[in-house]
Amino acid sequence: MRVNPIIDAIRFLTDSPLFYVFDLLVIASLVIVAINLQRDPAQRSIKDLSMFALRFVMGCMWWQQSLWKLPPTYTDRPDGTGGLHDWVSKMVDGAAFQIQSDFVQYIVLPHFQIFAPMVYAIEVLIGASLITGTAVRLFSLLGAAMAINLWLGLYRTPYEWPWTYVFLIAAQLLFFILDAGRSLGGDALIARRLERTHARYGLGSRILALIT
C-alpha cells in the first residue's frame, strides 16, 4: 500500500506505542477547548481557532518524535543502537562548532543513559504542553532550545536541510511571543482564574503567569 498522510495519521493514532496516552491528551485538549468556548466568547474567533490548530499540530509532532526514543534503550532497537543514539552520534562530525562536537563525543555519548531520559522527558512534556495549551510559554522556549541544538548539531550532516530547524525555532518562538496557550488552551483557564481571584500578585502566581 502506498504510504500517504491519511494512512500515516491512522497508524499514528492506533498503532503507535503509548497511543492511549496520546488519545487522553487529545481528549483533554478538546475538553479544554470546549470550556474556553463556553466561558469566553472572545475566543470564538478565527485567530484563536487557528492558533489552537497550529499549536496542536506542533504538539503532535513533538509527541511523535518521542515515540522512536522510548525507554529503556531510548532507541528504536532492542540492542540500544539506532534511534536517538545514532542521531546524537552524527553530531560528532556534523556539529557547526567544535565545542558542541567535543561535548557530544566526550560527555554525552559516554553518559548516554543519563542524557537520553532527559531528552525523552523534555520532548514528551513539550508535546503534552502544546497539545493541551498548558505552560506553553515555558515549553515553547524549551522547544526552541531543542531545535537550536539540532540546527547547530546537525548543520554539517549530509542530506540534512538546516532551514528545517530554523523554521521549527521560529514556530516555537512565535508560540511564546503570541501566548499560544491562551488561545483555547489550559493557559487561558489559568489566566482567567488568576484574574478572577486577584491572586496574580503573589510570587507563585507571578511565576505561573510567566510560564503560561
Q: Where do the language-model regions lie?
A:
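Transmembrane-helix motifs of polytopic, lipid-linked glycan transferases
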Residues: 125-129
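Extended, low-polarity transmembrane helix blocks
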Residues: 1-121, 132-212
